[in-house]
Amino acid sequence: RRNQNSIIAHPLHGVFLKKVSGAQILNNRIQGKTTLAASTDPVEKGIGQSTENCDTTLVANRRGNGIHQWNCEENLICGNEISDARDGIYFSFTNNSRVENNSIHHVRYGLHYMYSDANIFENNTFTENAAGAAIMFSKNMVVRGNRFVSNRGYRAYGLIFQSSDNSRLEQNEISENAVGMSFNQCNQNEVVANRVTRNYIGLRFGSNSDGNRFTENIFTGNLHPIETGASDVSGSLWAVHGVGNLWDTEHELDLNRDGIVDLPHRELDLFGILRRDFPVIAFLSESPAVKLLRFANERAVIPGMGSIEDAAPLTPQFWRIRAQSPNYRTRTALLKNK
């Protein structure tokens, strides 16, 4: 039940696990098949003429997965490097497993979860993929300490959450992606202490997502911090126990110097889903008219505009101030031990 220290080069499929419990896939290097030998068509070549074999590009959707699990329990996938596959690691009806310290690049989805519950993945790196990770129709997940970086393209994402509930995302770096995070039909999730920076869209918030709690996250350097479209986002909290998130803002009124801004932060999504059909509209993001609307929305909610409200936004000094507090150090230690 252990596969380790192997080099698996150019397979159509890498490692396949079916109804396996307690397996360990450790420290392997899996590089998928990117070309496929094909013969020229004898009809096109002409009767009596010799045909030739040539390599054709095997597009990502026609490749197999690097590691594929179906109907498994309690497996460990650790220390692997996976590239040039369809999905790096694919879970289907697989529960109570761990994915740790893997590096996955140049695939479709780095990590793809379907109908798989109570799994933990942490300290993995996902770069140069169509999506770093896609967690779909799953619950009770822990996503901790991962790097979703430079997943770029017209429809590229750092992290996709689709119809997934009661999960925890914490201390992840989500940077330089086309879309940092996407939430759609997701409920009762905790999003804590993640760095969502330098993405084209920081967080795309879809429909029917309620009861999600965002706190201590950093949303800075994103061209568009939030995209809500026509979705109602009032059912989620952007500050928990009086602690919100760090945003790009020019106004940081903190009279008592506790690291929490004294006025709420309202993030306005002016163009919403229009960006998908008309990308050039992004050039208006820093126009004087848009800046004026943002300024007005900070002071009073503009009816009919997509907006989220963080009741307790943070200053950059928040973490330094709280780190000096004994109560905060105790709370941080408890979070790390969860």
Task: Name each model-derived stretch.
Residues 204-205:
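Long, low-complexity, polar and repeat-rich extracellular regions
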Residues 33-41:
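Proline-centered turn/helix-capping motifs that create local helix->coil transitions or kinks
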Residues 4-17, 40-69, 84-90, 106-109, ...:
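Extracellular beta-strand/beta-solenoid scaffold signature
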Residues 2, 10, 15, 20, ...:
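Parallel beta-helix/beta-solenoid
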Residues 3-5, 23, 28, 75, ...:
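Consensus "Asn ladder" position of solenoid repeat domains
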Residues 5, 43-62, 209-338:
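Acidic, glycine- and Ser/Thr-rich low-complexity intrinsically disordered tracts
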